[in-house]
């Protein structure tokens, strides 16, 4: 069973991405981690997804949850500078060297994404703004979710 920790700055689109996953099932917590209330967690196609916000991921108390991840899905707002995720990326890299990180640049304006290819990032996927449900919720386009799931599988197989 592979665990994918979805993390990133507040408001970057982590919950939107998890909400948009197809065929969601029940989350099975990894063994030997402390109990934690997760904002979002589910299984999808053999992957266990769980969301941990940036402030929690930067802390030391929940390090077991970082170590349980077989891959990181770092969601960033494309309107922000890549520097906005560098402290979190450094924390993930120091806590879990060798764990692949897929950076998803959300709300992508359609330009080149070379600037987002940061040290410690195995791959970058742009993500369009998606469909707005209401003022607080949106959904990612299904074909983009499929592309992200395929890229995650590739990274996990290569690890």
Regions found by a protein language model. Give the residues of each.
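Conserved G1/Walker A P-loop phosphate-binding module
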Residues: 1-32, 41-48
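Structural motif
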Residues: 7-9, 52-53, 76-79, 106-109, ...
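Loop/turn-to-beta-strand initiation segments
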Residues: 45-48, 70-71, 100-101
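Inter-motif core of Ras-like GTPase G domains
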Residues: 58-80, 91-95
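Structural motif corresponding to alpha-helix initiation and N-cap regions
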Residues: 58-59, 86, 142
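Canonical P-loop GTPase G-domain recognition
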Residues: 111-159
């Amino acid at each position: 069973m592979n665990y994918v920790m979805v993390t990133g700055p507040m408001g970057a689109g982590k919950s939107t991405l998890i909400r948009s996953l197809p065929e969601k099932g029940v989350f099975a917590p990894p063994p030997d981690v402390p109990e934690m209330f997760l904002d979002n967690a589910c299984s999808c196609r053999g992957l266990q997804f769980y969301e941990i916000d940036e402030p929690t991921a930067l802390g030391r108390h929940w390090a077991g949850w970082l170590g349980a991840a077989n891959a990181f899905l770092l969601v960033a707002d494309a309107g922000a500078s890549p520097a906005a995720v560098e402290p979190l990326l450094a924390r993930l890299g120091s806590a879990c060297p060798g764990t692949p990180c897929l950076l998803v640049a959300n709300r992508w304006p359609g330009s080149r994404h070379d600037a987002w290819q940061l040290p410690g990032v195995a791959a970058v996927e742009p993500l369009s703004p998606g469909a707005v449900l209401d003022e607080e919720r949106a959904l990612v386009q299904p074909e983009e979710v499929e592309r992200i799931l395929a890229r995650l599988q590739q990274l996990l197989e290569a690890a």
